[in-house]
Amino acid sequence: MPKTISVRVTTMDAELEFAIQPNTTGKQLFDQVVKTIGLREVWFFGLQYQDTKAFSTWLKLNKKVTAQDVRKESPLLFKFRAKFYPEDVSEELIQDITQRLFFLQVKEGILNDDIYCPPETAVLLASYAVQSKYGDFNKEVHKSGYLAGDKLLPQRVLEQHKLNKDQWEERIQVWHEEHRGMLREDAVLEYLKIAQDLEMYGVNYFSIKNKKGSELWLGVDALGLNIYEQNDRLTPKIGFPWSEIRNISFNDKKFVIKPIDKKAPDFVFYAPRLRINKRILALCMGNHELYMRRRKPDTIEVQQMKAQAREEKHQKQMERALLENEKKKRELAEKEKEKIEREKEELMEKLKQIEEQTKKAQQELEEQTRRALELEQERKRAQSEAEKLAKERQEAEEAKEALLQASRDQKKTQEQLASEMAELTARVSQLEMARKKKESEAEECHQKAQMVQEDLEKTRAELKTAMSTPHVAEPAENEHDEQDENGAEASAELRADAMAKDRSEEERTTEAEKNERVQKHLKALTSELANARDESKKTTNDMIHAENMRLGRDKYKTLRQIRQGNTKQRIDEFESM
């Protein structure tokens, strides 16, 4: 049994360990990786490794892993990376996993400044990256400092502005809040839609020379070949779409491109090393094949993948809508509960007030009852005295009668009796007056008692009403491989058909131009960052970008411009650079 070989493959967000046989091919290892991570859009990707000369190289799929120039270490180290880029991410990247791998790789390129990104776009992209990681902003969860552990902006951008970490976080947070309701997967796609408009996105640069020996850059991307001046990798000067190229070949350091236009001369340039020409050839073949494939109807497999992706997206949207609905219901229930609690507290307070009023009324009633009793006793005393006076008056009357009788009987003592009579008469008069006074007082006491009785009845009625108020019940709660040959030359025919004439990429506009929301955000960010910018720290790329903006250029306008004229004119222009 042959001894197995340990292999470690690092994707953009995972580390995979495999044990392979000595005869395992690059394709077998590649297939094992894509199966493990659930990736079906395999045509964009490849396995990268550092060879024995420390050059970054793509693993050849048709050769054994052990037969290639991989460093003999344990485990063997590979990176799973995107080798080819789509023309339009929203049209071509189907699976969420594909979009995520591109997102992470592009983000890394932007943060490392391998892809130039202006400051305002960098902040906007950072907000989409935050949305994809954290979801909707929630002030209860995302407290101050929640982005402290995240690298979100290129070091160049941080150094060019007089803003501290908290101030950067505040700005990113504002835009994070703007993306409320956006699915994490949609935030990833929005990030890529903006990033693909960056001039250096998806471009592989190679240092070349023309026949004159001028130092230039060759850019190989999804749309064709572009030529750049040595000091400007943002603005290509000449462009050749894949649809104009018939054959590509190299012999040692010389690279030859034959155009479809037979009247046009060969497009020749020189690379510093043979291995670079091998890589250019592999990239040209892969990008050309994908360029042609895009201009044909989708294969059954791609159609199925798109249908499945649509279904999955629809399912996620349904789940999201359901979650949002549940969230709203929960929030409404919480508000209703708070309202009920508030009403309960108000009713309890009202009940307390009623109890206090009842207690006060009870005390007043008791006081009035006591006062009524006192007045009744006083009335009884006055009545008793009146009765006593009446009795005394009667007795005086009787005495008077007796005296009169005595007067008749005793004429002798008439004068004396007359005198006594006068006295008794005066006494009777006094007693009569006293009786009338007492009767008047008794009547007054009677009236007061009657008034107190009426107040008492009224208070009893109020108390009865208060006591009959119902008790408030508490409410219820609710590949293309690089050539294997050791030879110093290789050639590839780039087949073309009727679809090759489709150059729809020249009609494209940037996301900022067609999306008013993105345009508005970028304008606001440009204005916001201008005050904090340190102009002395501008880089060459910053100045080139600013000049392009001033002239109204963007990636696609430049593309249209550099493809003007026939192939011969552009090759002549390249030779004269």
Curated annotation (Swiss-Prot):
A motif ([IL]-x-C-x-x-[DE] motif) lies at residues 115-120. InterPro entries: Band_41_domain, ERM, ERM_C_dom, ERM_FERM_C, ERM_helical, Ez/rad/moesin-like, FERM/acyl-CoA-bd_prot_sf, FERM_2. The modification Phosphoserine is found at S74, S407, S527. Residues 2-295 form the FERM domain. Residues 358-401, 438-447, 492-519, 531-549 have a biased composition (Basic and acidic residues). Keywords: Acetylation, Cell membrane, Cell projection, Cytoplasm, Cytoskeleton, Membrane, Phosphoprotein, S-nitrosylation. The modification S-nitrosocysteine is found at C117. One of its GO terms (molecular function) is signaling receptor binding. It is found in: Cell membrane; Cytoplasm, Cytoskeleton; Apical cell membrane; Cell projection, Microvillus membrane. GO terms for cellular component: adherens junction; apical part of cell; apical plasma membrane; basolateral plasma membrane; cell periphery; cell surface; cell tip; cytoplasmic side of plasma membrane. It is a peripheral membrane protein. The modification N6-acetyllysine is found at K79, K139, K165. GO terms for biological process: cellular response to testosterone stimulus; establishment of endothelial barrier; establishment of epithelial cell apical/basal polarity; gland morphogenesis; immunological synapse formation; leukocyte cell-cell adhesion; leukocyte migration; membrane to membrane docking. Its main location: membrane. The modification N6-succinyllysine is found at K83. The modification Phosphotyrosine is found at Y116. A head-to-tail association, of the N-terminal and C-terminal halves results in a closed conformation (inactive form) which is incapable of actin or membrane-binding. It holds the Pfam family FERM_C. Ezrin-radixin-moesin (ERM) family protein that connects the actin cytoskeleton to the plasma membrane and thereby regulates the structure and function of specific domains of the cell cortex. Tethers actin filaments by oscillating between a resting and an activated state providing transient interactions between moesin and the actin cytoskeleton. Once phosphorylated on its C-terminal threonine, moesin is activated leading to interaction with F-actin and cytoskeletal rearrangement. The [IL]-x-C-x-x-[DE] motif is a proposed target motif for cysteine S-nitrosylation mediated by the iNOS-S100A8/A9 transnitrosylase complex. This is Moesin. It comes from Rattus norvegicus. The gene is Msn.
